[in-house]
Design a protein with these regions (language model features):
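Short, flexible loop/turn motifs enriched in small residues
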Residues: 89-96
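ATPase catalytic-site recognition across NTP-hydrolyzing enzymes
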Residues: 23-85, 99, 214-215, 219-221
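Conserved AAA+ ATPase "SRH/arginine-finger" region at the nucleotide-binding site
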Residues: 16-23
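Acidic two-metal-ion nuclease catalytic site recognized across multiple nuclease folds
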Residues: 70, 109-110, 205, 209-269
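Mg2+-dependent endonuclease catalytic cores in nucleic-acid-processing enzymes, primarily RNase H-like
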Residues: 99, 103-223, 264-269
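Hydrophobic/aromatic beta-strand patches that form the interior of the parallel beta-sheet core
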Residues: 14-16, 83, 155-157
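Single conserved hydrophobic/aromatic residue that forms the stacking wall/gate
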Residues: 1-10
Length: 269
């Protein structure tokens, strides 16, 4: 991929990105040709400067569907709030946490260093602000996240655990990744644009584009592109992706309580 090749450039040379419109010597007809071309990949790369754009046959969701997330006016908001968080493993990378209204992110926090006390305080404060019970909060249970799960008494996400309902996935992370892709393709996922910087937006797009199917196991189970391969392609761990896909956990652990539950249980007549 383009990004991997760029990272292999000679150390004393630098890449300066610019758009074709910034070239004073370019033929105007060339630009018009890019605007009208039916080759979507060429238009995105050469006209809009989206060099990472690729119609990857293994992609679970399209570039356009991912971009619709930002400022999405038709995302699913239910009035039910959740918290999801990817806690950096043993203090490395960033910790990413979000408050959701349905499938729309309404608050976001990034911790450059995973201090569990800061993360726990943030989670508890948001629980109080939005009245979010413990069973509607989840963070990854690997590494540092395990302490947050125990101390806050919230749900723990175990990547390699068994998928729900006996579905044909390699593990829980794969199952939730595919489910997230379904929601993205249905234009149900959203985030308030004023919550993120341009750099974070670009990073989220890159990471969600890594939601790709991978070689099936010998038993035919569906797989996601491995994290090691993702790191090679984008140069970092997909923390944003993991924070997003944990929201899908609640699709398998949400139960509607009937309005007449007391009557059904024989508590009232």
């Amino acid at each position: 991929p383009y990004r991997r090749q760029r990272q292999m450039c000679i150390r004393d040379r630098y890449y300066l990105a610019c758009l074709v419109q910034e070239n004073p010597f370019i033929d105007p007809d060339y630009i018009e040709g890019l605007k009208t071309t039916k080759d979507k990949v060429k238009r995105e790369r050469l006209l809009k400067g989206n060099w990472e754009y690729d119609d990857n046959p293994n992609a679970l969701c399209s570039h356009d569907a991912i971009c619709e997330i930002f400022g999405n006016k038709i995302s699913i908001k239910t009035g039910t709030n959740y918290i999801t968080g990817d806690i950096a493993r043993f203090g490395a990378d960033y910790a990413r946490l979000a408050v959701w209204d349905g499938w729309h992110i309404i608050e976001l926090q990034c911790f450059p260093v995973s201090k569990t006390t800061d993360i726990q305080t943030w989670i508890i404060n948001k629980q109080k602000k939005y009245r979010i019970p413990n069973h509607k909060c989840i963070v990854d249970e690997d590494g540092v996240g395990g302490g947050v799960v125990d101390n806050c008494d919230i749900q723990g996400f175990v990547n390699n655990s068994t998928p729900f309902n006996g579905e044909n996935y390699q593990n829980l992370q794969t199952q939730c990744g595919y489910k997230l892709a379904d929601h993205i393709n249905a234009t149900e996922v959203g985030i308030d644009e004023d919550l993120i910087s341009t750099a974070d937006k670009e990073e989220i797009i890159r990471e969600l584009e890594q939601l790709q199917t991978w070689k099936a196991d010998s038993d035919g189970k569906l797989k996601l592109k491995p994290k090691e391969e993702i790191k090679m392609d984008i140069g970092c761990s997909p923390d944003w992706r993991d924070m997003f896909l944990m929201r899908a956990w609640f699709d398998y652990n949400e139960y509607d309580i009937p309005d007449d539950i007391e009557r059904r249980l024989g508590i009232t007549a």
